Amino acid sequence: YKLFGVNAELLIDHAWGWEPCTIADVKAYKPENKSVVSGQVLQNPYNFEQARLVVRRIEELLQEHLPHEIAVLFRAGFHSYQLELALNQAGVAFRKYGGLRYTEAAHVKDVMAYVRLLLNPLDLPAFARMAAQHHGIGPKTVEKLYTATARGDAKNVEKAFARFPALLEDMRFVDSLRAAPQTPAATLNAVLEHYRPRLETLYPEDWPRRQQGLEEIVQMASAYTELDLFVADLALESPEEEGDDGEGRVTLSTVHSAKGLEWNAVLIIDLVEDRFPSRHALARPEDFEEERRLMYVACTRARQSLDLYVPAALYSRAERGNQ
């Protein structure tokens, strides 16, 4: 292929110059490994139910396959956030390729700092994370500001924060959320509205993509009635074992990162417009063709079993619900 590409005539003509050489009927070729022996397309009403269905299917597949022989593929890294949470809750270990886990993403840590401080005003790491979003605030300044806040003296707080009015505004915003409790999803929505200008400033090159990832967090919160339980579950880490070489984990991967790899069982999620194919691909024919090629790559990663998940509706924060 490297020599002749896809030109069959060149290959055939060149073959006669290499003796001894035979030409065999392609139909006589019998591959050693069979193609996918089972596959299914599963439609679910909403994409937030998809994670539960996928976890259930993975638990079934683990009866027949080792964890490292199972993979879940998706178009973009943030598409797996809900699944990561569900896998953590189920105690299913996983490793991820292509994009950070939601617990590692900087913008997610930024947003969750507000929520953690809302639940616990004395959460020093959360306060430090929120303060770090502002220019000119180092560790020593954080310590002084935190001490003033912890003492609860309004005059001392005003004085300590005089040089940092934007951070003081953040603190007042958190206080306002604490004074008027809302559902977890509504709370996260409010935090995102407050944080968005800073998101655009801190991450000017890719803030729209990060915004989409944060909207996934809001959708995850919609399944909870208690904010503290949501935060506790979000903080769960995938179980790890000492000396783990990855064989004891299911693989989560973007399609791009999966090129050249194969698994016995493959599950492809979020097969719906605006996810896979992506939003931008729908506007240009050439981009849509690239999505078709990616879909081919994704499907051909499966050796034995292929499951396709098609949500009937996607959560849209802009629409305040599903669309």
Predicted feature residues:
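Conserved RecA-like helicase motor-core motifs
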Residues: 91-101
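Conserved helicase C-terminal RecA-like lobe
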Residues: 66, 80-89, 105, 112-323
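Residue-level "edge-of-site" marker
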Residues: 14, 100, 311-312
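Structured loop/turn residues at secondary-structure junctions
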Residues: 46, 75, 99-100, 222, ...
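Helicase P-loop NTPase motor core
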Residues: 1-93, 118-120
